[in-house]
Regions:
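Residue-level detector of functionally pivotal "anchor" positions at catalytic/ligand-binding pockets or at interdomain
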Residues: 658-659, 822-848
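Beta-propeller-forming repeat regions
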Residues: 24-30, 37-39, 46-51, 68-659
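Solvent-exposed loop/turn segments flanking beta-strands in beta-repeat/beta-sandwich domains
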Residues: 47-61
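Terminal processing/anchoring signals of secreted or surface-associated proteins
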Residues: 1, 20, 729, 826-831, ...
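Short beta-strands within extracellular/lumenal beta-sheet-rich domains
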Residues: 702-725, 734, 774-779, 813-818
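Terminal, low-complexity interaction segments
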Residues: 757-824
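Extracellular carbohydrate-recognition regions
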Residues: 658-691
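Short, surface-exposed beta-strand/strand-loop-strand elements in extracellular ectodomains
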Residues: 598, 737-756
Length: 870
């Protein structure tokens, strides 16, 4: 944004300039009331349509507590408490309400999709990326959640994967659809494959969902998506899979489906373009070849998706789908008018040339020389980069015009991150920062319109991470840093701004300053947990520090393992600061439900900024945030200039106003999975079970299956831990014996509960082995209440004496066991002080108050006034 535009903005009451374009999305005030260390912070949206004279009143439980607020859209109520009802009232009589949270986050439970088998694995589901859209047109956002199984695969890796599942919720967790969308086995699950478009595409005020589908994909009503296609598509064999023995999808029908956001129903399905072998407009199943750069079903399975306004903001938007970026790069622009999906154009970036086709396959434009070939990134960005009133598509090292032409390319190739924003506020248009994966590696900042290089450097290896953010106030414009080194540099001229760098992940507005902070999930691969935090720049001490830790606020978990991104970061509620959505950490993914956590800032601010979702570049960023390696959204204008803030004298906020920590309590019932012991014949103690006490368990694991010895005594015993009842279990497995000459199946013959001698197993279960094969078999047994133990008995007669050793080694299953439990009223976690004179002396007492130093395993004792199990 130029200084002349800033002056014009100042003279017109600080309205946004023409470069900060607006979208036509119905937005209400979306008030939120967050508990802080100082009371309750109430905030609400400022909108670009607000008159300058508009003021706000705030009511608590019907009583007016603040009047005629005009210069901010947040108010701290020192006397507020969780559960209070707040009403925000405008001077025009508009009202909206919110109930105060009991912390700086709220949570809701969602039902986990059932595990799904694929090949020799079974995927258990965890929340992954989220998108947001108003699916019913009421001015409130709904959440669209993509579930990924724990056997999801990178496109570059072999292995079976279970299907992608998609579900929809209101902000309070209410599920919207009759069924989840299930993309089926012919869509491989992973970060590179399924990119969701959630946006109002036909102008009816309600968001649709678009994504790639295939034979076997089903919609939110349970119907096959092929039923919404033409006659040829309707004839698809939805029972057929094209998954190879290595878990790759080698061929088959490829579709694009648009779903009704409110019901999940497939409204229209067409053939996906291009096909996996580069077919421009296929009309039948295709088979892969090396068109996209390799022949192992990897580079053809790299996708991005976005939305762009190619006719200007007063016309309907267009969905953008990209396939391929390491070599041939195809970008497909698709319109939805409420009844039909149609091709606007298809851009093809080939080696030494590019061309653009219309929906009939006729060439609209073409040119030899530089192209978008090999210039893509694990992401995509949208914006009117040259202020001509039309969106351009930034794929990384190249920009595509609204007509599908190549606008520019740097020729610097592929990278893992992209940041499109007003990085250089004194320069016309928008700029791009990106790191580079391919030689000569390094990084660059370039003009998104011309491709001219502003800052660049080369390196000696893959530069896998990079971030651009306005992090240091005194440095005008954005700064950037990357994995190449530890230095923070200016996007404007490349000069060193700071000798250290913060996290290289997401930028965020949280503290109330008109400058960026950083967010990172800090994934720990050894514990499979996260330690999310926000970092800030302290202008007084000239240092980078952690402003806010999240681990003790609901035990949140970030997405995408080492990428450690939020499910979603966006300005969803309250004023202009951004919300963070994550899910609660779990030791496994076996419980029937999981918690979604929504965080909103507890920090007051003196700045009034229109809802970020009204800025076009930012709103488009929320659409594409889920694409590939999730990237943070950026504004299309320079916020300090809009607010008239001088960064050279600015002092950042350094004190968090977060409330006391809060751990979300576990459910009273749930599911827990058998874990692998640290050593052979080891004992594993879970929350509800103890296993391996008779030496059944080995330390060997494969694809989530544990080797469990059925032993020479032909039995396995699981003990029930104090404070729990086990009410059901599921065992999935197969015999470990792989004889090629005989059936070596193992039979489960009985299930016995506690001390009862009655077998509750309804029929013998065969776990196949040898010539019977090694495909997993699943059996669920429930309807009981085990208080002490569960005994499983087996028939190992198919395993001959010659094939077994002294430990019954070959009498073993590859098994996955999950237990359904409920907590009992054992009061183990309740305070118990009746017979204990000194409750907090750190010593161990029996239940009758006698001190002991020889506590026995499995018994209940008292320490520091609380019961525990040894």
């Amino acid at each position: 944004m130029k200084k002349t535009l800033i002056l014009a903005a100042a003279l017109t009451g600080l309205t946004l300039s023409a470069t900060a374009q607006q979208v036509k999305e119905k937005l209400n005030r979306a008030p939120v009331a967050v508990k802080t260390s100082q009371g309750i912070l109430v905030s609400w949206r400022s909108l670009t349509t607000d008159e300058k004279e508009l003021t706000f009143n705030v009511y608590r439980n019907g009583e007016k507590v603040a009047s005629n607020i005009s210069d901010v859209t947040n108010w701290l109520d020192a006397e507020g408490k969780p559960g209070d009802t707040y009403k925000v009232e405008t001077s025009k009589g508009e009202t909206s309400e919110a109930t105060a949270w009991d912390n700086m986050f709220t949570s809701f439970d969602v039902k986990r999709p059932a595990s799904i088998k694929s090949g020799n694995t079974t995927g258990r589901y965890r929340p992954d990326d989220m998108c947001v859209g108003d699916v019913d047109g009421d001015g409130n956002y709904e959440l669209i959640l993509k579930w990924l199984p724990d056997n999801a695969r990178d496109s570059g890796k072999e292995g079976y994967s279970s299907p992608v599942i998609i579900s929809a919720y209101r902000m309070d967790g209410t599920a919207l659809w009759q069924h989840d969308i299930n993309l089926g086995l012919n869509i491989r699950s992973g970060n590179h494959t399924t990119q969701l478009v959630v946006y109002d595409m036909d102008g009816d005020g309600k968001a649709e969902i678009l994504c790639k589908t295939a034979a076997g994909s089903t919609d939110g009503t349970g119907a096959y998506v092929s039923e919404a296609g033409d006659a040829t598509i309707q004839a698809t064999d939805n029972t057929k899979t094209y998954v190879t023995s290595k878990g790759r999808v080698s061929g088959g029908e490829e579709f694009l489906t648009v779903f009704n956001g409110l019901t999940g129903k497939a409204m229209k399905t067409i053939w996906y373009s291009p096909g996996r072998s580069g077919e421009d407009f296929p009309t039948s199943a295709t088979a892969a070849n090396s068109y996209f750069g390799d022949s192992n079903y990897n580079r053809s399975e790299r996708y991005n998706a976005a939305v762009a306004y190619l006719d200007g903001l007063d016309k309907l938007p267009t969905a953008i789908f990209q396939r391929g970026y390491y070599a041939n790069c195809i970008i497909w622009a698709v319109d939805w008018n409420g009844s039909e999906l149609s091709t606007r154009w298809l851009h093809k970036g080939l080696s030494g040339k590019w061309l653009t086709l219309d929906g009939k396959g006729d060439t609209l434009y073409s040119e030899s020389g530089k192209s978008s070939f090999g210039q893509g990134v694990h992401g995509i960005s949208i914006g009117d980069v040259n202020t001509d009133g039309y969106d351009e598509i930034c794929i990384g090292s190249a920009t595509i015009s609204h007509e599908g032409k190549l606008l520019c390319t740097t020729g610097k190739g592929h990278g893992d991150a992209i940041h499109l924003a007003d990085l250089c506020p004194d320069r016309a248009g928008l700029e791009v920062m990106m790191p580079h994966e391919e030689s000569p590696y390094g990084y660059d900042v370039h003009d998104a319109t011309t491709g001219s290089i502003i800052v660049s450097a080369t390196g000696s290896s893959d530069n896998g991470r990079g971030l651009a953010a306005d992090f240091v106030p005194a440095s005008r414009g954005y700064e950037f840093w990357s994995s190449a080194d530890g230095i923070m540099r200016s996007c404007v001229d490349g000069s060193t701004v700071f000798e250290k760098k913060p996290d290289t992940n997401f930028r965020i507005y949280w503290t109330g300053d008109p400058y960026d902070q950083t967010f990172d999930g800090h994934y720990n691969s050894s514990t499979e947990s996260a330690a999310p935090c926000i970092k800030n720049f302290n202008t007084t001490t000239q240092s980078i520090y952690t402003f806010q830790n999240f681990s003790d606020y609901g035990a949140p978990m970030s997405c995408n393992t080492t990428k450690a991104t939020p499910c979603l970061q966006a300005d969803l509620l309250g004023d202009w600061r951004e919300e963070i959505i994550m899910f609660q950490h779990e030791s496994d993914f076996s419980s029937p439900t999981c918690k979604i956590l929504i965080y909103s800032t507890p920090e007051p601010t003196k700045y009034k900024v229109p809802c970020l979702m009204e800025d076009h570049v930012y709103r488009m960023g929320i659409v594409w945030q889920n694409s590939s390696y999730n990237q943070p959204p950026h504004l299309g204008y320079y916020l300090p200039d809009y607010l008239g803030v001088d960064g050279t004298t600015y002092t950042t906020q350094t004190v968090s106003h977060a409330p006391e920590t809060a751990i979300v309590p576990e459910a009273d019932e749930g599911t827990e999975t058998l874990k692998t012991p640290a050593a052979d014949k080891g004992v594993v103690t879970g929350n509800c079970y103890t296993a391996g006490e008779n030496g059944e368990l080995t330390a060997s694991e494969s694809s989530g299956y544990i080797k469990v010895r059925t032993n020479n005594n032909d039995a396995i015993v699981f003990s029930v831990n104090e404070g729990y009842e086990i009410v059901g279990f599921t065992i999935e497995g197969y015999s470990n014996n792989t004889s090629t000459t005989a059936d070596r199946s193992i039979y489960m013959t009985g299930v016995y509960i506690d001390e009862a001698e009655t077998n509750i197993l309804d029929e013998k279960v065969t776990f196949p082995g040898g010539t019977a094969g090694q495909s997993p078999v699943t059996k669920t047994v429930d309807g009981f209440e085990a208080k002490s133990k569960i005994k499983l008995t087996f028939d190992n007669s198919n395993i001959t004496t010659k094939e077994e050793d002294a430990n019954g080694k070959n009498k073993q299953l590859y098994a996955r066991v999950s237990f359904q439990y409920k907590k009992t009223a054992s009061a183990i976690n309740q305070v118990f002080t009746e017979n204990v004179a000194i409750a907090n002396d750190g010593k161990v007492y029996t239940l009758d108050g006698k001190q002991t130093t020889t506590a026995a395993k499995g018994r209940v004792y008292i320490k520091n006034g609380k019961k525990f199990v040894k």
